[in-house]
């Protein structure tokens, strides 16, 4: 298990617990000589895939490949009051996950994937891929 692709529906850099946890996991995988690639969507104007920026923001020295993917769905940055905020988020998450998994499987020969995303896990699993799925709590979607 030397090559690991970590696909997540988060944005980086960010002060959220999820983003901090993801970087921590990747940092320790890299410390243990694993070749890691992080893939995430460009959902925010603050999103950045420059490893030097991430190292400065999170305070680590390890290196790994970082790819910010295009996020062209109309569910980006939920400013203002929206009655459909959660629904829009899930639709966007579903569509992005389906697209990114298809793309990664076409151009990547990774043997192991790591994710916190329900939809990324679903699409990788449907394609018989080896997936490490990190889950911290049961959600309504996961119960479904």
Give residue spans per PLM region.
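N-terminal subdomain of nucleotide-sugar transferases
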Residues: 1-62, 107-108
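Short loop/turn segments at strand-loop or loop-helix junctions that form parts
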Residues: 7-9, 67-75, 136-137
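A short, histidine- and acid-enriched strand-loop-helix "catalytic/donor-clamping" loop
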Residues: 12-14, 119-122, 129-144
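Alpha-helical and His/Cys-centered functional microenvironments
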Residues: 25, 90, 140-141
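A cross-family glycoside hydrolase active-site/sugar-binding cleft signature
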Residues: 39, 116, 134
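Short, polar loop motifs at secondary-structure junctions
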Residues: 43-44, 117-121
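An amphipathic, basic-hydrophobic alpha-helix
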Residues: 49-51, 55, 63, 69-112, ...
